[in-house]
Swiss-Prot record:
The keyword Cell inner membrane applies. Belongs to the ATPase B chain family. It is a single-pass membrane protein. It is found in: Cell inner membrane. GO terms for molecular function: proton-transporting ATP synthase activity, rotational mechanism; proton-transporting ATPase activity, rotational mechanism. Its main location: membrane. This is ATP synthase subunit b 1.
């Protein structure tokens, strides 16, 4: 058997030596370990991304719930403010009506009092005028004693009727 040492043979020997060197230096194990480490890193990153996504969804749901609660509370506050404004308006209207009614009653009372005082003044003036007229008529027609008697009686009657 004859061996030919041609280029193919040396290429084959170089390949075998290279593969032996690679196996001796444990390159396939290092590659497998490196790929496993990379796979673990990717798996951990995916798990972290999933956890962050779930946390973000949870926070989003919580913020949406809080927003709805805030909107409901704002609507409640607005409704309460509207009710209070209506109550204050009604109360102010009632107080204004009461004030106007009281002022009207007071004005009517003052008018009635003025009417009564005017009637008293007119009666007093009429009595004074009647007394003066009676004095004049009696002064011309009666003597002093009769005049004095009539005057006293008339004044007494006027006093009793006015009081």
């Amino acid at each position: 058997m004859e061996f030919h040492f041609d280029a193919t043979f040396f290429a084959f020997v170089g390949l075998v030596l290279f593969l032996a060197l690679v196996v001796y230096l444990k390159v396939p194990g290092m590659m497998a370990r490196s790929l496993d480490d990379r796979a673990d890193q990717i798996r951990n990153e995916l798990a972290e991304a999933k956890r962050l996504r779930e946390e973000a969804q949870h926070l989003l749901a919580e913020y949406q719930r809080k927003r709805k609660e805030a909107e409901a509370e704002a609507a409640h506050i607005v409704a309460a403010a509207e009710r209070e404004a209506q109550m204050l308006t009604a109360e102010a209207k009632k107080k204004t009506e009461e004030f106007v009614a009281n002022r009207t009653a007071l004005s009517e009372q003052k008018i009635k009092q003025a009417e009564v005082e005017a009637m008293k003044a007119v009666r007093s003036a009429a009595v004074d005028l009647a007394i003066a007229a009676a004095e004049t008529v009696l002064g011309k027609q009666a003597d002093a004693k009769v005049q004095s008697e009539l005057f006293g009686n008339a004044v007494g009657q006027v006093k009793t009727r006015l009081n």
